């Protein structure tokens, strides 16, 4: 009963989460082409963005069309590389802070009642929506490993989710610290992509910006592969194979490629209404799933909760 209810919600979330690929890639392209614009005059930013995103999404499609090896691509290769390069940048920044945290004044929006503005800003991380989408991939990978017992699958998903949550929390905390400390060096940036580029350039120069570009490349690559795979698998099952997994993967990759060329700031602005619409139901579904045992996962509870949001 529970599965029959959340399946459409997960499908919708997967579709919206696929748009997160383009948003994350906006960060990637902003960082990469900030670096390129300072060191090369032979490319315009628009052309460089087009060429780079084309190559990037070619890799995304290559890996997405081989979902059986996704644990190798992401778990054993891409994730460790991302964590290594990210750690190099963060350690360099923390060892020589630009300003003490206590000396940094909050922006006007966060001076009073900061919880709700921060919550809305947090929508942009796509974590809740991506969690719904990635859950499909995680369960599918576990089953391909020969695990078919639902209880064991649930335990594996819970443990992997808990570990992921801890790592993400750590990454967010150190990123916040580095960002706050950088206020002693730079004015408030238009977006996080610009801020990261400035921080990397300050502490490590051109090498730092190169490390940052590599770090964000791997971060976005693993996210994009997971999102495209989740979206393609979901819609393949929905259509009963009438439009193949391969076709859906190509479609979602092409869609993300097109959107990624709009630019980071524009993507963020366009995504806000969508996030405001989809995030409350996503949070409600996740919360109800955790407390569902207390009302027997009654379908009517889910329906009424979503109606009243």
Model segments located where?
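Hydrophobic, small-residue-rich membrane helices and short re-entrant helix-turn-helix hairpins
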Residues: 66-77, 115, 138-167, 185-197, ...
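TM-loop-TM module centered on a large, flexible mid-protein loop between adjacent transmembrane helices
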Residues: 171-221, 273
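Membrane-water interface regions at transmembrane-helix termini and the short interhelical loops
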Residues: 57-78, 144-147, 257-269, 286-297
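Helix-loop-helix connectors at the membrane interface of multi-pass transporters/channels
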Residues: 24-48, 143-144, 224-251
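Conserved small/polar residues in nucleotide/adenosyl-binding loops
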Residues: 308-309
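Select transmembrane alpha-helical segments in multipass membrane proteins
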Residues: 2-15, 47-53, 113-121, 202-219, ...
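Hydrophobic alpha-helical segments and their helix-loop junctions in multi-pass secondary transporters
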Residues: 83-110, 128-129, 140, 177-180, ...
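Selective recognition of specific alpha-helical transmembrane segments in multi-pass small-molecule
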Residues: 81-93, 157-183, 253, 257
């Amino acid at each position: 009963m529970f599965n029959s209810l959340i399946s459409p919600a997960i499908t919708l979330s997967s579709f919206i989460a696929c748009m997160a690929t383009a948003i994350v890639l906006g960060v990637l392209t902003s960082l990469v082409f900030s670096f390129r614009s300072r060191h090369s005059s032979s490319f315009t930013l628009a052309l460089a963005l087009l060429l780079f995103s084309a190559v990037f999404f070619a890799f995304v499609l290559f890996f997405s069309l081989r979902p059986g090896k996704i644990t190798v691509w992401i778990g054993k290769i891409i994730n460790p590389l991302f964590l290594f390069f990210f750690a190099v940048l963060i350690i360099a920044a923390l060892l020589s802070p630009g300003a003490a945290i206590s000396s940094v004044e909050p922006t006007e929006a966060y001076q009073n009642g900061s919880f709700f503005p921060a919550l809305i800003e947090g929508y942009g991380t796509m974590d809740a929506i991506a969690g719904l989408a990635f859950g499909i991939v995680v369960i599918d990978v576990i089953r391909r490993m020969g695990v078919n017992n639902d209880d064991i699958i649930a335990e594996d998903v819970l443990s992997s989710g808990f570990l992921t949550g801890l790592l993400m929390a750590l990454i967010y905390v150190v990123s916040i610290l580095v960002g706050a400390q950088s206020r002693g060096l730079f004015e408030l940036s238009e977006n996080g992509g610009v801020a990261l580029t400035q921080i990397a350039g300050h502490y490590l120069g051109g090498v730092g910006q190169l490390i940052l570009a590599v770090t964000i490349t791997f971060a976005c690559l693993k996210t994009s592969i997971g999102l495209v795979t989740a979206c393609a698998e979901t819609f393949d099952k929905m259509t009963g194979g009438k439009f193949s997994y391969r076709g859906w993967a190509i479609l979602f990759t092409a869609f993300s490629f097109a959107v990624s060329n709009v630019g980071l700031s524009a993507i963020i602005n366009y995504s806000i209404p969508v996030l405001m619409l989809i995030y409350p139901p996503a949070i409600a579904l996740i919360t109800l799933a955790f407390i569902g045992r207390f009302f027997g996962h009654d379908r009517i509870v889910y329906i009424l909760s979503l109606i009243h949001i």
